[in-house]
């Protein structure tokens, strides 16, 4: 294989790898943005169900929502 052919293959591989790096960086940026949106949404849900504090666990939100839905179901039965 000639030296020029090897250089061309290596150059093509470099271009491919740079493209993959850029794609990965774009994907990471999209995922970070999506993560921020989801965090904000969870924070809103937590506030809506009365959970406050610096550290909020998803399990706490789930439990609070379960309790609220159970209370709503009980109230609906009582009204019947």
Curated annotation (Swiss-Prot):
Top-rank taxon: Viruses
Signal peptide bounds: none
A Pfam family assignment: GP57
One BP annotation, GO: virus tail fiber assembly
Keywords, alphabetical: Chaperone, Viral release from host cell, Viral tail assembly, Viral tail fiber assembly
Subunit-level organization: Homotrimer. Homohexamer.
Functional note: Chaperone essential for folding and oligomerization of both long and short tail fibers. Required for the assembly of gp34, gp36 and gp37 (components of the long tail fiber) and p12 (the subunit of the short tail fiber). Together with gp38, participates in the formation of the distal part of the long fibers.
Name used for this protein in its record: Tail fiber assembly helper protein
């Amino acid at each position: 294989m000639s030296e020029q052919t090897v250089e061309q293959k290596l150059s093509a591989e470099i271009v491919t790898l740079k493209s993959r790096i850029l794609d990965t960086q774009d994907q990471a940026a999209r995922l970070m943005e999506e993560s921020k949106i989801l965090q904000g949404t969870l924070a809103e849900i937590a506030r809506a169900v009365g959970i406050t504090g610096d550290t909020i666990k998803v399990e706490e939100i789930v439990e609070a929502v379960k309790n609220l839905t159970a209370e709503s179901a009980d109230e609906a039965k009582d009204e019947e």
